[in-house]
């Protein structure tokens, strides 16, 4: 589980940021290509990437998949209201479901917010009425379905 707001902040210099920007552009870019583009030795790039992984700045290297092209028609955002004493327990249970892409405790009108990706409306219904319904502590949910995508990004490096 990621605990971003309360994690120790890692100091990033311009070389770190340049490496991160290039890896976000193309996660398969070789260290030698990164080295060439930012004009530092390849050994520096390798050491920096290893440090960024070790310190948790780079969580993992993965392909960014377009869910719609991969046969998943529904991306939904679900706000959850939970019993105050059970919020953390509810989050731990929700985190176990493969349908959940992003999950966190939030401020505002709801306690928990998540993004889920499923193949169709029937699978979304099963997720809410069968899987989520079994979790003790959930009081109510509010679901919004993404109808179009204007931007699908990832964490920016300034």
UniProtKB/Swiss-Prot annotation:
SMART domains: HTH_ASNC
A GO cellular component entry from the record: cytosol
CDD domains: HTH_ARSR (cd00090)
Biological processes annotated in GO: response to amino acid
Listed Pfam families: AsnC_trans_reg, HTH_24
Keyword Transcription regulation: yes
Top-level division of the source organism's lineage: Archaea
Official protein name in the record: Uncharacterized HTH-type transcriptional regulator PH0140
Origin species: Pyrococcus horikoshii (strain ATCC 700860 / DSM 12428 / JCM 9974 / NBRC 100139 / OT-3)
């Amino acid at each position: 589980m990621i605990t971003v707001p309360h994690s120790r902040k890692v100091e990033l210099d311009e070389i770190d940021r340049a490496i991160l920007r290039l890896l976000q552009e193309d996660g398969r870019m070789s260290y030698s290509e990164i080295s060439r583009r930012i004009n530092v030795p390849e050994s520096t790039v390798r050491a920096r990437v290893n440090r960024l992984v070790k310190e948790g700045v780079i969580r993992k290297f993965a392909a960014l998949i377009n869910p719609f092209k991969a046969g998943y028609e529904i991306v939904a955002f679900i706000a959850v209201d939970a019993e105050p004493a059970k919020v953390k327990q509810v989050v731990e249970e929700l985190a176990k479901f493969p349908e959940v892409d992003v999950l966190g405790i939030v401020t505002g009108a709801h306690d928990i917010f998540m993004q889920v990706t499923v193949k169709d409306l029937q699978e979304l219904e099963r997720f809410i009425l069968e899987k989520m319904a079994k979790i003790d502590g959930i009081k109510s949910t509010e679901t919004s379905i993404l109808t179009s995508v204007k931007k699908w990004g990832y964490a920016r490096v300034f």
